[in-house]
C-alpha cells in the first residue's frame, strides 16, 4: 500500500510538472528544449503508471481493471500512451499540452479523491474471473483514451 501511495503522488507530481512545462513551451516558443523535456516527462509518467498497474497485477494476481481506481489509472496510461505516439509521429507539442492536463485530473481524482476503500483491491467476483475481462476491458479503455485525445484535439482545432 505504501508503494501505491508513493507512486500515486509521484505520478501526480510528474504530470503536474509536465503540464506546466508544456504550457511554458507554448508561451515561450523560443525554447524548443522545453517541449522535449515535456515529452520525456510524459514518457516518465507513462512508465510510472505502468509500474503502478504492474505492481498491482503482480501483488494481487489479476489484471488491474476491476475497480474504479485501477480503471482510471489505466485510462490515464492510455491517454499518455496515445499522447506519446501522436507526439512522436507529428513532432508537435500541442498534443501534450492538451492531453496531459486530462491525465493529471484523472490521476488526481483517482489518487487523491477516492477513499481508501475504493482504492483497495478486493477479490474478483466469479463473473470477472475470465480471460475475456483482460481483452475486452483493455480494448475498451484504450479506445476511450484515444477518443478522449481525439475529442480534445478536435475541440482545440475547431
Residue ranges and their predicted role:
Residues 1-158:
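Polytopic transmembrane helical bundles with strong interfacial aromatic enrichment
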